[in-house]
Amino acid sequence: MNGKIWVLGDAVVDLLPDGEGRLLQCPGGAPANVAVGVARLGGDSGFIGRVGDDPFGRFMRHTLAQEQVDVNYMRLDAAQRTSTVVVDLDSHGERTFTFMVRPSADLFLQPEDLPPFAAGQWLHVCSIALSAEPSRSTTFAAMEAIKRAGGYVSFDPNIRSDLWQDPQDLRDCLDRALALADAIKLSEEELAFISGSDDIVSGIARLNARFQPTLLLVTQGKAGVQAALRGQVSHFPARPVVAVDTTGAGDAFVAGLLAGLAAHGIPDNLAALAPDLALAQTCGALATT
């Protein structure tokens, strides 16, 4: 199949500590990470979004282009500034994020920024693109448009609660996006937040009953992944790894998953899903080392 994978959302400059009291300028943002990951795996990826027409924005556009990501729909916005995030790491390699620019250029995405979609293509989005207008309406329009064209939607909430002024807006947008998604990737914490259950089996059952996604994956870190495909549920153990920095691990997992799904289609059963999930887990594990 090898359908194109469009990734919509924010391209972010991450400022990472170097251990010497300085911050390093690094390309980041979950959607941008996924787009680059797909391209590195040999997939056909394109980025949809806005960055500022500023040094950080031009840096991000150049970086993605160098990685063979289609940037024809990555707009430089002279009126807005590129999203910039300070990343802080604890002794276990876990991270916290401080968003320095709000609202940033990515939240000014307009319908005219969208490409024409085609059958067999994928669109991957995260909830940050839904956190404010006009990006929210444009993102939902993109999800609906690719479904009408015969394509597929992948959704990774990647919830950042501090970016939402109204908690009910967050829940309403999550519900709408989850209902449109063919493939959903959640963390355990996100599953509990959305389903209202701390039990992973119960949470998966509630989401499957409510939203009926074709594929639902719940990542559990070192414990592996719970996968629900067309009503079948199974656990896939994690690959052992010594984590140095978990930043971007979930994005690498999604890139591996989407590369497999775009190449082979959504499988009919869990046995057929196993190779694509193994690739996703390998990508996620390698990203932490």
Residue ranges and their predicted role:
Residues 1-70:
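Glycine-rich phosphate/adenosyl-contacting loop at the front of the ribokinase-like
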Residues 36, 84-88, 224-227:
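Short beta-strand scaffold segments in enzyme catalytic cores
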Residues 44-126:
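Conserved N-terminal subdomain of the carbohydrate kinase-like
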